[in-house]
Amino acid sequence: MTRYKAIISYDGYGFAGFQRQPHARSVQEEIEKTLTRINKGRPVVIHGAGRTDSGVHALGQVLHFDLPEDRDEEKLRFALDTQTPEDIDFISVEQVSDDFHSRYNKHSKTYEFLVDIGRPKNPMMRHYATHYPYPLELGLIEEAIAQLEGTHDFTGFTASGTSVEDKVRTITEAKVRFDAERNFLVFTFSGNGFLYKQIRNMVGTLLKIGNKRMPIEQIQRILAEKDRHLAGPTAGPNGLYLKEIRYEE
């Protein structure tokens, strides 16, 4: 068997998430159907580096799969790109060693979150950015977001019901910038892993701080007390993008 690593992007609007699930359309299922056709009807299972939720997009999701023979990498990429649905794009395909695992090999992830702060909002971006129609002070958000960098227990920013016991994660980059051309706020978070709905909960909290309905010091309180009720609301999935995954050599 030959193992392949692929980098893909997808429009999350039409999917119930990346992971295969009954009675709902998923990115995994669509790709596996295409690979099974290419593999002459023999089932192929893919393994993704991350499991994005319903409505969440990806610019650089990584996955791997095995096929019984060597194939030309570009021809395989082209076949997958043209035979999968139009809301999935295969950016690259390459052969990798048999011990490569997209999820378990040590890596870091970068996410972006887009917030449309225009009044009126841009209706063409309603599935691709979360609209926030209330006044915001960027300086307050910048001061608050810097406190998220470093190694912390992010229990207070995690959705209830998660089965993950160790909630300590390291965020190496947390920043926000204003995109004047689109009238968007662009949040960027990089780290060694993120908990269920962690980024959406952090963004919801930061927007509340920017709107002066929560003090900047609330970030430290949430981290210290590990209480989800102290954080802001969960931002919508439509603004979230898995931007890049980087593997250690």
Swiss-Prot record:
One of its GO terms (biological process) is tRNA pseudouridine synthesis. Substrate binds at Y111. It is an enzyme of class 5 (isomerase). Pfam families: PseudoU_synth_1. The active site is at D53 (nucleophile). GO terms for molecular function: RNA binding; tRNA pseudouridine(38-40) synthase activity. InterPro entries: PsdUridine_synth_cat_dom_sf, PsdUridine_synth_TruA, PsdUridine_synth_TruA_a/b_dom, PsdUridine_synth_TruA_C, TruA/RsuA/RluB/E/F_N. Homodimer. This is tRNA pseudouridine synthase A. It comes from Streptococcus sanguinis (strain SK36). The gene is truA.
